């Protein structure tokens, strides 16, 4: 009787692990599909690498709040893990330099400063966004080491 109980518990644990794995695969698959669709619709695009780093219990980084007066640049850009893909051409982009305390009980992302910049993004080019904290601005440079 005890072995039957242990066998059924082990079976449920294995089933739970398998279902969790399938859920992760489905979520990753959806993200990859959405990326592929966006890249197919926007063949002339650039990539922006947005820096992010930890300082103790806080995360510092750069985010995009608007692209061409569109919140988060929906349809004009596509967010990916270490940055964004953006359609080639001239865009007005609002960058934010922020700090985020990940040990806090509630979400408290503090924007240190914002800067709106107009830039002409060339197709098939990777751009690195650098923080110039002393001047409270950003520098956009083409990265020759990374490729799309």
Indicate where each model-derived feature is located.
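Short loop/turn and low-complexity linker motifs enriched in small/turn-promoting residues
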Residues: 1-148
